[in-house]
Amino acid sequence: MKTPITVTVTGAAGQIAYSLLFRIASGSMLGPDQPINLRLLEIPPAMNALEGVVMELRDAAFPLVNEIVPTSDPDEAFAGANWCLLVGSVPRKAGMERKDLLDINGKVFIGQGQAIARSAAKDVRVLVVGNPCNTNALIAMHNASGVPSDRFFAMTRLDENRAKSQLAEKAGVHVTEVTNMAIWGNHSSTQYPDFTNARIGGKPVTEVIKDTEWLKGDFITTVQQRGAAIIKARGASSAASAASAAVDTVRSLATQTPEGDWYSVAVCSDGSYGIEKGLICSFPVRTTKDGGWEIVQGLPVDAFSREKIDATVNELKEERDAVSSLLKH
């Protein structure tokens, strides 16, 4: 039997985690023969609710689950963690400015970054799902002294999946036909779903979908505004689709990317495509056969794409500047 992998999930009694934990426990994320230790972090007022989730996890009797540790202590939660899925964050409430949200969450992610540095495994990898995820990841990364910056990721796979779904529907094909879909920038309404480099059935999207006006207009805005549309329709934010995207992200990071394809995840910029070094920005990324990752290089960026990328990167800079006092320089 393989050695168990320790997976820490924060915000473990929340809606996204409720969908996510059962996918992890079933083997969807790390494979059908990989045992898992689950370490679940919550704030003290949510510990009763978390106990209920733990009861359900136990009642499902998943063969792959080796142990389950619910806790409100970050050091206990991150002890020996190989994967940290930082799902918990304070949601934006009516009348709250984005800056307020950045500040409140900033304090949470400082503490989690420090606890990861103290307690996690040497090979730890950290995926931030809780919004604003790019800047939350930046704060955690800056405060996780000794943990390499290439271990920190923020999730834009939900945006990629939404974009693929829209393109497939428009083209009248199965979603698996859509490949090479890059999301650039921030996981926010400024993100840029890049149809110019995407493919449908191996052909450039623009050869399959001739409606350029739709591609440059409704397609982009639908993907950018999808989260808000779901809240309006459902009365609650997207939880199951976010959990599914987190599973997809970890699976993509953990397995070699098929030749010629890529996936989207926000990583610490190395200056590629003129995007300022040090920002946590979404790029097209590939996982290499040695288990590392790399930003896909040499993609054409036309004037339309450049304008869209610059706009979302500017928002990332503004967010970074708003939390600069929380970053270790």
From Swiss-Prot:
EC number: 1.1.1.37
Gene Ontology biological process terms from the UniProt entry: malate metabolic process; tricarboxylic acid cycle
Keyword NAD: yes
Active site: H187
Domain of life: Bacteria
Assigned keywords, A-Z: NAD, Oxidoreductase, Tricarboxylic acid cycle
GO MF term set: L-malate dehydrogenase (NAD+) activity
Record bears the keyword Nucleus: no
Residues given in the record as NAD(+) binding sites: G11, A12, A13, G14, Q15, I16, A17, N105, Q112, V129, G130, N131
Binding site for substrate: R92, R98, N131, R162
Annotated HAMAP family: Malate_dehydrog_2
Function: Catalyzes the reversible oxidation of malate to oxaloacetate.
Family, per entry: Belongs to the LDH/MDH superfamily. MDH type 2 family.
Protein name as catalogued: Malate dehydrogenase
Species whose genome carries this gene: Akkermansia muciniphila (strain ATCC BAA-835 / DSM 22959 / JCM 33894 / BCRC 81048 / CCUG 64013 / CIP 107961 / Muc)
